[in-house]
Each structure stands twice: as C-alpha cells, then as structure tokens.
Amino acid sequence: ALMGGGDMTDIQTALFALRDPAYQAFQSKLIPTIDPQTVIGVRMPALRKLAREIAGTPVAEGFLQEPPHRYYEENNLHGLLISAIPDYDGAVAALETFLPYVDNWATCDLLSPKAFRKHPPELRKQIRRWVEDAHTYTVRFGLGMLMSFYLDEGFQMEDLDLAAGVRREEYYVKMMAAWYFATALAKQYDAALPYLRQRRLDRWTHNKTI
C-alpha cells in the first residue's frame, strides 16, 4: 500500500530506494503521533548520508522551501539539512519556516544546528520566543536547545526560570521539561535543586524529573 506513484519527486524516489520494511514497522510503533502510511522506513545512517550528498545543492535549496512534506523521512531529511546550515541567521530563518510543520518528537529532537554551537547571545533570545510559541514541537525544540547549549559554561540562573515557566499540558512538552531539569540536576545541581525542593515545577514534571 505504501508506495509512491509516478508523481514522486527525486528526493522521494531516493528515499524509497533506501527503504527497509522491517524498520518501517519499528519506526511506526515508536512514533504514535504520525500516520504509519507516511513512514517509508529509512534508517538514520542512510538518511544522514543522503543529507551529506545533497547539502548545499539546488535540489536541497528547493526542498527546504517546500514544507509541508508528504513523508516522515522527508521531514527528517529537512531537519538534517537545516542542522548543516553553517550560518546562524540562515539556520534560524530555515527553522522558522520548518518548525510549524514538525509533528513528532523524533523529527524535533534530531534538529541540532551546528551554527548554534558558538552560543551566540541571540540564540538565548530566540529560545525565549520558541518556548512561548503556540506549537507543541516549537516549544519542545526551544527547551531542547536550552538543554543542549546552556547547561554548561553558558549557564545562567534565569534559564531555569525560563524552563520552569513553560506551563503546557502537552505530553511531549512536559517530557522535554522533565528531561531538561533532570539534566540540570546532573550539570548544575546547586542551582537546580531548589526547583525540586521548593516544588516550583508542576507535579507531573517534578515526578518525571526525579
């Protein structure tokens, strides 16, 4: 049933050529929020290789302008291509286009823009905007970036307040908030401990964190 017709794009054709049916079944179970019909079944190493091969080409440039995509792997490929964008402004602009279409935790969590590694001060401001967004996975992404880039040498006390201030009911936001605070306890114990001792988090997040 899951087969592209004659109207497939070059990228879709390339993805179907990398298909592993057993992996398709596994992935579909792992990500309950998406329609199994949209999962082709491409393993991540093959997807990363394809991303490396097309990064910076006109094909990739066109693809980045075209969300929403039809398939889960197209979204993951899109995320990998964004992660490879070398300049900060370019990466943020591409994320602003793409984040509203992210519809699952796995695509959200593979987004790791290399342009963010220099910890520009602008990123912290951008994270503030993301965690206040209406879209579930934009908020999850913002919390993930706060965890990835600001729990080591870039840490500030206000980051904990920012994360604690995210009061959302969506499971995939609350899980990321708990992950953030669990990591904060490991990396910034003295700063993070009062948030648990003084019950500053909602009960669900508190319980998941510990």
Question: What residue spans do the PLM features occupy?
Answer:
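Alpha-helical scaffold domains
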Residues: 4-210
